[in-house]
Each structure stands twice: as C-alpha cells, then as structure tokens.
Amino acid sequence: MGISFSIPFDPCVNKVSQWLDMKVSYTHNLEKNLAALEKTMKELKAKRDDLERRLKREEARGLQRLSEFQVWLDSVATVEDIIITLLRDRNVEIQRLCLCRFCSKSLTRSYRYGKSVFLRLREVEKLKGEVFGVITEQASTSAFEERPLQPTIVGQDTMLDKAGKHLMEDGVGIMGMYGMGGVGKTTLLTQLYNMFNKDKCGFDIGIWVVVSQEFHVEKVQDEIAQKLGLGGDEWTQKDKSQKGICLYNILREKSFVLFLDDIWEKVDLAEIGVPDPRTKKGRKLAFTTRSQEVCARMGVEHPMEVQCLEENVAFDLFQKKVGQTTLGSDPGIPQLARIVAKKCCGLPLALNVIGETMSCKRTIQEWRHAIHVLNSYAAEFIGMEDKVLPLLKYSYDNLKGEQVKSSLLYCALYPEDAKILKEDLIEHWICEEIIDGSEGIEKAEDKGYEIIGCLVRASLLMEWDDGDGRRAVCMHDVVREMALWIASELGIQKEAFIVRAGVGVREIPKIKNWNVVRRMSLMENKIHHLVGSYECMELTTLLLGKREYGSIRSQLKTISSEFFNCMPKLAVLDLSHNKSLFELPEEISNLVSLKYLNLLYTEISHLPKGIQELKKIIHLNLEYTRKLESITGISSLHNLKVLKLFRSRLPWDLNTVKELETLEHLEILTTTIDPRAKQFLSSHRLLSHSRLLEIYGSSVSSLNRHLESLSVSTDKLREFQIKSCSISEIKMGGICNFLSLVDVNIFNCEGLRELTFLIFAPKIRSLSVWHAKDLEDIINEEKACEGEESGILPFPELNFLTLHDLPKLKKIYWRPLPFLCLEEINIRECPNLRKLPLDSTSGKQGENGCIIRNKDSRWFEGVKWADEATKKRFLPSCQLISLK
C-alpha cells in the first residue's frame, strides 16, 4: 500500500485571500474612508471645543486640569496635524487610483496612504469615544512657602524650640503667643513657620495670614483661599457664609497648620471656615497677639508669653547694633551704653532702633545727652504710651531736621502693614512742601530717596521689593502707632491726624472740630458719596484712593458740589483707583492751594470745568484713565511740572499737543501714543520731558524718523516701551542722550530683527522682549562694530533679562559679557537661542547669583556653554518654571 499525504491547503489560501482583500480595501475604500475621516474629525474637534470651554470655566474657579485629560487634548492636537496633511493630499491620491479603485498607478504609495487613512480613522473614532465625566481637580499648592525673615533676635532660640515642641504635642490644637508690641512675636512666629516649612512634620499645607487690628472675616477667607488655589469670579461672588462653607469642606480633608499673625480680638474660626484644630489630629493653629485676654477667648489654656530679653542678652543685642568701633571710641561709652540699653527694657524693636541710632555717636557728651532725653519721658502706666512710644520717639527726635521727621509721620497715613511705593511717597512730600521742589523735580526726588534711606537705616521704615523693580517701604505697626501718637501731639490733639485707611468705613467719620484736622486718610474704604461741606480750614492732605498694592478698592462714585468749599489749604488730593468716579464737581476750583491731584484709574472723560483755577497745581496724574477724551483747559495750569498720561486713551491731535507745549514749567511727562500721533513725535519739547514713553499701534513709514529724533530729544527717558508695532529696526543714536534709560519693554513687534540701539543705554536695568517673531539678534555684531559703537560694552548694569516667544533669536551678543549686576535671565520659547553671552565670571556673584529660567528642560540640555567652567558655574542655577 503506497504512502499518501494530506495537505491543509484551504486555510492558507483563505488567510492569503483575507490579507489581499485588506490591502485592496485600503485603496478601493479610500474615498469612503476619507469622507468618514473628515466627518469624524469634525465631530472630534467639536467635542474638544466643548470640553475646552468647560475647562476654561472650571480653571477660572481655581481648579486645575487632570493629566489624563491633558494627554487626550495633546493626542487630539497631534492627530489633527496628521489628518490635515492627509486631507491635503487626498485629490492627488484619488487621481492615482485606476481599475475601479482596485489598482493604482503607484500601488505601494497608494497602499501606504490608504492604510494611514484607515488607521487614523480608527484612532479618531477611539478618541471621540472617550468619555470625560471629570476633567479638573482641586488645584494643588505647595505645602509651605518659606517666608522672608529678619535676622534672628538674640535670645529667642530657646523660645523657638519651646514653641515648636509645644505646638507639636498631641493634645495641643491651638497655641497662642502674646506680648507687647515690638517684642519679636512676628519674628518668632515666622521662624516657627519656616521650621515647619523645612521639616513638613506630616502636614499637607501651611497657611500664613496677617490679621492686624482691623479684622475682617472675608479678608482672612480670601488669603486662605488664595493659598488653597481658589479664585476667579465664582469665588469673589460668594458671600461670607458661602466662602466659609467652601473653605471648611476643603480644609476638613487636609492636615494643616494655620499661622495668624497680630490678632487683636477673638477670631471665629467657624465663621471663617476653619475646622476646629482641637477636634482632630493633624490640625494646628498658632497665633500672635498683644493681649493675654485674646488667648483666653481663643480657648488657649496655657498661652506662651513672649517676654522682653533679659538684661545681659538685651545688652548683647544692643552692642551688636552699636558696633565695636563706636563702643571702643571712648573708655566711658560702654558703661553709658549699658544705661541706655537698660532704658530699652529688653524690647528688641527699641534695642534695634536706639542701638542703630547710637552707632554713630562717638563722644561722651552725645551719650549723656541720649540718657537725658530718655529719662525725660518716664513711664508711669502699663501700655504702649508709657514704655514703647517714648523710647521710639527718641529715635524720631534724633532724626536730622523737621523735614525727615515730617516725612516719617506722613507714612502713618497709609494702612497698617501697607507696602508704599517710594515714588508715591516722594510725590506727596514734594507737593506738601516737606521737600522743596523749587529747584526741579529731579533734585527733589533725589532728596526724597535720601530721606527714605535715612529712615530705613534708622529702622523706622523697612524696604520691600515686589520683584518687578518697583521698590516700596513698609512701617512696623509699633512705629506707625508712635508716628500717629506724635502727629496727634502725643495724644492731646487726636483729631489733627485722622487715619481710617483700609478699615472698610462707608462714610466720613464724625469729627468734633474739623478746623484742627491737618491730614486725613480715608483710602481703601467703601465710601460711595462725598456730600456736604466741612470747614477744614487747616486740611492739607486728603487721601481717598488706593495704593498700588492695596487689597481694598476705593468705591467713590460722586462728590457733591459743596464738598470742596472750605478747604483753602488742601495741597494733596488723591482720588486714584475709584473706578466708578466719572466726573469731578466744578467747585474743585475752590481748592486754590492744590498742588497734587491723582485721578489714576478713574473713569473721567474730561477735566473738570474749574480746573483752570488751580493755578498752583504742579502734579497731575491721569494714567489709566481709559475714557479720557480731552484735556481742554490744561494750558491754564501754568505751574504744572509733572503730567502722567500713561495708558490713558487721550487722542493725540494737534490741539492737544499745542496745549501741552504751552506748559512752560513741565518737567516730567509719561504717556502712551500711537505711532500715527505725528504731532507728538515731532514735538521736541514734549519728547524732551518724557520719562515714560509707550508707543503702541501699527506701522507707519515715519516711525523710524521720529525715533531717531527721540534719541536726540531727551535725556530724561527712563522707561521706553514699543508694543504692537510693525517695524524692521529701531534707529537711535547718541550715547550721551540715553544715560537715564533703565527699563525697556518690546512687545509684539513684527519685522523687528535686532535691538542694537540698546548699546546706547548703558544704565538699562530691565529688558523684556516678547513675541517678536522676526528678531534674530539682541545686539547685531555687524551694526554694533560700525563707527563709534565698536568700543561700547553693553548692559553693564542690567539686572533682569526676559526673552519670550522669539522663534528666530540666535544671539544676545556674540561674545561673553561681564553682566556684573545680572540677577535673572528668563527665556521661554526661543528654540534657536543655544548660546548665551556668558563665561565663568559673568553675572552677579555670591550666594544669590544669576539665575537662568526656562520652562523646557530640553532647552537646558541643548545650551552650548562657552567652556566646562561656565557650565559648572551656571548649570546649578538653572531653574525650570511652570506656567499655569
């Protein structure tokens, strides 16, 4: 019998047949698949757009998008780009097919294209089918953010250790620390906060809130909400009760430590929305106050008293402030120094202030005089007025001249814990004639900065920087109380200095004798209407506006015609940030002594009819008056020296320019103009007084010619901004005329290829360039090496450099620069910028050296450093930034 074989041939044929059918279907069904792909992609895009609108609403409420949803959005964006390419080639590919779509003139190419269409169709269908019930979550925040701290007070280490251990005890939910003003409670609480920041101690989040004397529940709620990532319109529209419920529901799920600094009365935690820290582990509250009674009302059984320093410890602190040079300048001074230190009663604030005041007193006679002055203000009863204020008043009395003293008292007009812009203070001082401005505003400003420096060095003011180059000062609350006490003639004439700033009052306070009121501050309040007439015959300052960093917007709407009738000495009137104020009464003409008028961020459209009678006015602020249509009548203000029009909507017609050119005493002008405002750009007089100039608008052929004239027209220009202009280059020349320029901001300028003109600004401190898609160089080598420019080394004083969305930028400078003052380089979306003009010696040196920031870690990996030493110097200071 022969051997036979059976081969299963049919299944193989079947599989091959299926494979061939699938390949043929890619081409045969191409048109149907393309139509389905286009339709399904439209549906996917509609779904994405709906979800993105929902995402925008939820992110406005402080929520953050889920990573899963972001991956989906990225996938949709990726597949959309691919499909755009596929659909672009559809006609070519369809024409390539033949034999009823079963074959192709290029079979391989058609197969690949058809397969890609088929696979993308399946991918789009899958993306479209994904369901998102939730796309956001509660925004995550850093657990703790370290707070800036003054140097540790000598002798507080033991108390800090004790407070930290006490707060961490299982049975302690609330810890209160009390003591007199200036004893170091805030410093101790800050050290405690930073200690928790370092160790975390198992808590999810730490929250710091300054409460201050005028306690407002919603203010505390808003600060806690900000830390929790809440915000937007939905939050601000909630009432106090709703905010409390919202905070409670979030905090009850977290372990937290809440630090409340400077409370003056019982704080109702339930009303704020803070779960009771005593009811569950993982919740802690630490606060400071001046009153032991407040501790008891807050439910603290064993409050910690922050006591003044013991005599020997206090003397150690005092000696450090005085310095060994002064202590050793005469054999008798150390013994007298111990007597002076003893008069400070161990109060750290007084020891610091008096010690620094005495640091330059190097004769026995000066020290004996100091003891005599301190003894002349004996303390007779417990409290601020009998112990702290007389001591602080000695530092006040020791200030040189009434000018510096009056300047300090003026700072007390601002709200408690206020950050006060230095330039605002100085403007007020000049117009109140505390500083003589007769020799020019710039000289007067220099004097103002000298006074501020004197007060800072005397520890009566503290400097504060907002990180954006705008410097401010703040006043310790004890020093502020001292200033108010002195201004009211040691409490005898309390109505001379009326300060109700930032406390939420809704009407003008009731005053027994308006004739004694000299200065009044009602800034950052809720007063809607000023009605009636008040006989304020001695009133020189009236503040009804808001600070730059104020938290409460002024709400003034109307001023009655008779309100200004009896204020013949009023020199300073601040109505800034009253965004519901549309006009001023004609009777403002009665303010015959007015020198300063601030209408910043108001809604006025015209100057009041009585403006021409204000013959003494020297300072007029109309910045951000977005409805301003005319300044007719301003030519009557013959003594006007400072006019601020930045970001106002004033139309720059010929009449406006002519009227301004008649102001013969004008020294400082800030303004925003459209390049089409040829009349302004052609005015040598106005350009020569420009301190801040912003050019905004579209391209004009004459813009460069006017910019060239600008370079020879002004030596006062400090801030220069060009925004949304189409211009190939900025032609400026003349190094001698840009010595004052410190801030340059260029935004959204099409066609701009280089900024070589910046070599003529040797004092520039901040340079920001955003959205200049054609920019290739900051300083162009070829242009910079032409003529006189070849010997100039740019940016010797530059502090901050920001470069954002400059896709063609390749070079900042062609070789390393010293950059001796450079603190920060912020770079975003500059893919072709791979080499920085740095070597190992560039940038600000020391512990707080130059920082380089970018949002993309791959950019750092691609940087071409000058050498290994440069890489070693700067790579550790490179920081990733996250954009919300």
Swiss-Prot record:
Homology family: Belongs to the disease resistance NB-LRR family.
Residue positions binding ATP: 179-186
Source domain of life: Eukaryota
UniProt feature coiled coil, ranges: 20-70
One Pfam family in the UniProt entry: LRR_14
Annotated function: Probable disease resistance protein.
Any GO MF annotation of the entry: ADP binding
LRR repeats, residue ranges: 569-591, 593-615, 616-638, 639-661
GO BP annotations, alphabetical order: defense response
Keyword vocabulary terms for this entry: ATP-binding, Coiled coil, Leucine-rich repeat, Nucleotide-binding, Plant defense, Repeat
Name the UniProt record assigns to this protein: Probable disease resistance protein At1g63360
Gene3D superfamilies from the UniProt entry: Helical domain of apoptotic protease-activating factors (1.10.8.430), P-loop containing nucleotide triphosphate hydrolases (3.40.50.300), Ribonuclease Inhibitor (3.80.10.10), Winged helix-like DNA-binding domain superfamily/Winged helix DNA-binding domain (1.10.10.10)
Domain comment, as recorded: The LRR repeats probably act as specificity determinant of pathogen recognition.
A single Gene Ontology CC term: nucleus
NB-ARC domain: residues covered: 136-440
